[in-house]
């Protein structure tokens, strides 16, 4: 994806460091990966973190292997082949109308489902019934997401349109990061709406009864 404007909102250093060291959960990795595809600045910062991580690994004292390590490895070689994975939808087959991030390649992507007035979501398979959730969100122009807070960090990468949250405007290529406990109520651009790739760690907590009602039905 080629952008014609500078990216002004990025994941913070803690998120990028976790990405570099492999400790960031898969849902958030997919969103950060999407951001890195469009953001040279974050790719550069990530390179610095990866270099630091490499130095830290080299500085660690070697750890002795368990006495049965070889036997356990050999046992896995004798184990039967796991069944082939079920066929999955690919981003190329997903009728989104926009270019999907390469970070979603190979991920199963569900169909758009009505979630709330003017809002549809598409779940990333395998990342819905877990603590970490990843999904695409499509909001019609001028739609307000129900007021909510959440247990963990929420990341939203803008793929189309624009989003306004906490008086900040996020456009294509931007990554909106909301910290745990932040109560917020983003709304989509009044002219274009928006499509975002979102990762949430933990539960969201709608502040209003309408949001709680919706949550009962869609388990977000
Ligand atoms: Zn960035």
Regions found by a protein language model. Name each.
Residues 182-206:
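Ligand-binding loop in jelly-roll beta-barrel domains
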């Amino acid at each position: 994806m080629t952008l014609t404007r500078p990216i002004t909102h990025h994941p913070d250093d803690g998120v990028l460091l976790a990405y570099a060291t492999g400790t960031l959960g898969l849902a958030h990795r997919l969103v950060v990966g999407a951001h890195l595809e469009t953001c040279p600045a974050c790719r550069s910062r990530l390179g610095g973190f990866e270099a630091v991580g490499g130095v830290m690994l080299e500085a660690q004292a070697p750890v002795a292997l368990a006495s049965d390590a070889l036997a356990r490895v050999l046992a896995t070689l004798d184990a039967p082949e796991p069944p082939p994975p079920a066929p999955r939808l690919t981003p190329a087959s997903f009728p989104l109308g926009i270019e999907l991030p390469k970070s979603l390649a190979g991920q199963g992507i569900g169909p758009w489902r009505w979630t709330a007035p003017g809002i549809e979501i598409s779940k990333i398979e395998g990342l819905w019934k877990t603590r970490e959730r990843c999904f695409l969100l499509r909001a019609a122009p001028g739609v307000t997401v129900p007021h909510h807070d959440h247990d963990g960090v929420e990341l939203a990468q803008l793929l189309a349109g624009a989003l306004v949250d906490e008086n900040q405007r996020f456009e294509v290529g931007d990554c909106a990061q909301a910290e745990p406990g932040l109560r917020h109520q983003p709304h989509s651009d009044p002219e274009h709406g928006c499509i975002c790739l979102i990762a949430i760690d933990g539960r969201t907590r709608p502040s209003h009864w309408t949001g709680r009602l919706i949550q009962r039905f869609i388990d977000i």
